[in-house]
Amino acid sequence: SDNPNIDEDEPEVLYTALTHSREPLGMMNLIYFVQLLAEEQNSNTELEYLISNREMWFIPIVNPDGYAYNELIEPNGGGMHRKNRLNTNCGNGSNRGVDLNRNYGFGWGSNDTGSSPNPCSATYRGDTEFSEPETQAVRDFIINHEFKNVLHYHCYSNVYIHPWGNGSFPEEPDSSTLVDIGREMARYNGYPVGTGLSTIGYTVNGDAVDWTYGDQSIISYVPEVGSTSQGFWPPESDVLELCLDQVHSNKIFAFVAGSDIIIHSYELSHEDMVPGETVELDVVIQNRGLSDSDAYIDININTLNEF
């Protein structure tokens, strides 16, 4: 926002990362994007527009205790602790804790495939839904705002995942809306778009995306950033490129929080014209955003031939 201390009547969008504490690239990507917004807002018209017309919120670390533990055991990176640090009577290592992305209240504990009742499992869902302070904090933050869409970053697999966690698709028109947004996010990096089952081959329950969409009716996505070979802790030399890969998707996700008017398609009655001849032009305008548009639309048509 260009007025961060004022609650303006602008579309709101939220980005989160590091729900799983061994997935730091989500955080790095968000910090890079925030830096880009701050440093290039006066030289980049898209960024300037977003700052002036959106309220963008960032939670770069959802799981600070888990991340601090990874820093403790592997100061140079590479710690593989995934969950938070709740004492679940599984020792002091990486088996303890609750998987925060199985602790949300929508579909929590619906089966033992998408999450686990075993306190020492990597996908342990907790004793009850929203049992953990981290998920409570994210829940309350979302409820206290009017977000149009939320992006929950994870690693890895180079895919964009939308609801539902059980592999089924939302009803229309939301299903098409989600796919259209995901495909535009993937325009330049080519990430596959779909459910977790269709993209990475497994189901989840009690996850943040299903709660955000299913309980709060907010369009939500999980970007899984980084390739299988790069893993949870990609080489330092790969980090900048991976952050750059998400700039377009981060911008698009902010654009679609409001009205986002584009030329969807156009058709000429015929393309070859002799001097003085007229043609008919049919233009289809689409609002691919999540908010209504009350603006006038101007279309300027210019010739590419100076003669």
Residue ranges and their predicted role:
Residues 4-7, 92, 111, 275, ...:
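Short glycine/serine/proline-enriched coil/turn segments at secondary-structure junctions
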Residues 71-72, 76-266:
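Metallocarboxypeptidase
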Residues 271-277:
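Short, solvent-exposed loop/linker segments at the N-terminal edge
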